[in-house]
Amino acid sequence: KWFGARSAEEVIGKTDFDFFSREHALAAFEDEQRIVETGQALPGYEEKETWPDGHETWVSTTKLPLRDPAGRIIGTFGLSRDISDRRRAEAQLAHYAEELRHRNEELEEDLEMARELQSALMPRHYPCFPPAATSAESALHFSHFFNPSKAVSGDFFDILPLSDTTAGIFICDVMGHGMRAALVAALVRALVEELKGIADAPGEFLAQLNAKLTSILKQAEMPIFASAAYVIADTAKNQLRYANAGHPAPLCIHHEANAARALPLDRCQRGPVLGMFSGAQYGASQRDLSIHDMVLLFTDGLFEVEGAGGELYDQHSLMRAVNGRVNLGAGDLCREVLTEIQQFSANKQFSDDVCLVAVEVERLAS
């Protein structure tokens, strides 16, 4: 049947040259001659045949020397097993693997573009206060660290020049990781830009941001949220004004007290995360601002770090680290705290998205 014969008699006395292509038959003949000459079997090799109608078949063949009772080689014999289905399945798998590789390459290219775009959205140059001042003369100095755990991140920050003497510092952390979180972070950034007109009122700013974000996410049926903190440093009024949306409380280093503490909320609770409750309200608090005071805003990836023994670097650990370095400038303090946490980590690096922003008061306008 394999050769298209109706009975065994039709194949008796015929050779490979009667059934296969000349190339195939010659190769088989040479193999058999070598077996006769050497006595060495030819186990499990694969043969391909293209038939006159164009279809292809594969067999796994084992050929051995045929010996007479005295042990002399008088010919060869063999067994062939049809493996055409297996080879077709392997070819199909190879095709799927190549297709998957191509799609992965496209995905990697898209992720790289997304990473570059997200990087471009982050502040590359810090604003000066007033704008005509050099970075050394600016009333406010900034420093930041941004480390996505994947190609892109749900962490985001922005620095908003509200006047010649006032800056708004916004930070948020979108639930989850990767592309999904990064897309929502980009949406939050666009909304922050849209709401700059009310950015001098922290509570109202977060309330409007939440209302718009919640509306969009509900339409998209995306169960996702973001925590955020917003701090205004006003060097004309010597004042910090701030509001919080379910975010870790920023730390303020008071130069006169030579100590850091979490920014407290005045007669109001921390507001809920953004994107969950459309009518949420956010109370604003304020504190006096002195020269050389510093405020640190950060996402929870900075302190939710596990050590080699399973112990956790928590907010209390972070507070101790900052209090041990209150005499350093913003840049040096950030670098040393980050180094301490990375050295504490079991794998010496951050496993979550991390964003840290510091603002230091160099001079007051009043």
State where each predicted segment sits.
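PAS/LOV-family and closely related PAS-like sensory domains
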Residues: 1-76, 141-151, 157, 161, ...
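PAS-family sensory/regulatory domains
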Residues: 2, 9-23, 190-196, 273, ...
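Adenine-nucleotide cofactor-binding loop residues
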Residues: 17, 67, 84, 175, ...
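PAS-family sensory domains
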Residues: 61-64, 72-82, 170-172, 298
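PAS-associated C-terminal cap
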Residues: 68-72, 79-95, 176
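… and, occasionally, acidic/histidine-rich disordered N-termini of signaling adaptors
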Residues: 96-296, 348-366
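C-terminal catalytic subdomain
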Residues: 229, 285-297, 302-366
